[in-house]
């Protein structure tokens, strides 16, 4: 959960504190005043913070609250799912589904975007060792045929269906529910709120990053290992210089422009839907390692 810290004038804070105190209301005794004084003297726990153009915002880590509530009702297993790679110009969308073990939840789980690469790698290994998970890929060809949203939802659904144990409830990040054989709950900003979705976001991100490093060896010159296929200036320059590779998404505007420059006679290639579900383990994901 993200909250903007309100900038309240010092006098307003003092007035509010005075109204709230037992002494100000005239009904407090010395013990209450002493307890209030100790509570005021004790520093409050500091939430995680990040900087933005509007100042400092408090960021609470994801919790296991939703999963635990279902577990108490006898609804288990519960899976969280998320994807990585909607925005890039090259490479697949990678979707992951994770069922956490309530008794072996790795510490430090968070939205993959709020973690460093080193933190993601460390948590990825812990998730693989303690959780049930599956990964599915939507190829650039499928993205071209179905569009990025439909391809992403397809991959998320396939990842859930590939889990070693069928879940009874699924949490998915975003606004859209997916086609699964159980109740599906879409949670906007779920990778920062629901712990199992956060775990899935890490698995998807690390898997895709490793895959793009492997594709960089197959197609040198584009810098996939650096930008992971996103449309940064270095990637756009390489695309303009070399033209599209087989790993680029043919219908994304910068790729279309590069193809017109290098292959003005060529049609958009016919989609070759090679992307199938792949259930992976920690060692199998170590692509290019």
Curated annotation (Swiss-Prot):
Subcellular location: Cytoplasm
Cofactor needs: Mn(2+); Mg(2+)
Record's keyword annotation contains Metal-binding: yes
InterPro entries: RNase_HII, RNase_HII/HIII, RNase_HII/HIII_dom, RNaseH-like_sf, RNaseH_sf
Biased composition (Low complexity): 7-24, 31-55
Catalytic activity: Endonucleolytic cleavage to 5'-phosphomonoester
EC numbers: 3.1.26.4
Domain RNase H type-2 residues, every copy: 76-264
Function: Endonuclease that specifically degrades the RNA of RNA-DNA hybrids.
Family: Belongs to the RNase HII family.
Name of protein: Ribonuclease HII
């Amino acid at each position: 959960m993200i909250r903007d810290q309100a900038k309240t004038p010092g006098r307003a804070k003092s007035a509010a504190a005075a109204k709230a105190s037992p002494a100000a209301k005239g009904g407090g005794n010395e013990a209450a005043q002493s307890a209030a004084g100790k509570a005021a003297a004790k520093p409050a726990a500091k939430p995680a913070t990040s900087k933005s153009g509007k100042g400092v915002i408090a960021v609470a880590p994801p919790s296991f609250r939703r999963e635990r509530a279902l577990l108490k009702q006898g609804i288990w297993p519960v899976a969280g799912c998320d994807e990585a790679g909607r925005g890039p110009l090259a490479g697949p969308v990678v979707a992951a589904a994770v069922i956490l073990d309530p008794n072996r939840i790795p510490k430090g789980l968070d939205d993959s975007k709020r973690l460093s690469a080193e933190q993601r790698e460390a948590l990825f290994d812990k998730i693989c060792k303690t959780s049930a998970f599956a990964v599915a890929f939507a190829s650039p060809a499928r993205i071209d045929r179905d569009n990025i949203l439909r391809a992403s939802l397809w991959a998320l659904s396939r990842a859930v269906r590939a889990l070693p144990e069928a879940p009874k409830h699924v949490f998915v990040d975003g606004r859209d529910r997916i086609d699964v054989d159980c109740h599906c709950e879409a949670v906007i900003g779920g990778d920062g709120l629901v712990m199992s979705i956060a775990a899935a976001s890490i698995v998807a991100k690390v898997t895709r990053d490793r895959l793009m490093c492997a594709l960089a060896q197959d197609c040198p010159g584009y810098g996939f290992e650096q930008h992971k296929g996103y449309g940064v200036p270095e990637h756009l320059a390489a695309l303009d210089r070399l033209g599209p590779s087989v790993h680029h998404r043919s219908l994304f505007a910068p790729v279309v422009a590069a193809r017109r420059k290098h292959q003005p006679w060529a049609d958009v290639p016919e989609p070759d839907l090679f992307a199938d579900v792949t259930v992976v383990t920690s060692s199998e994901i170590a692509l290019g390692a």
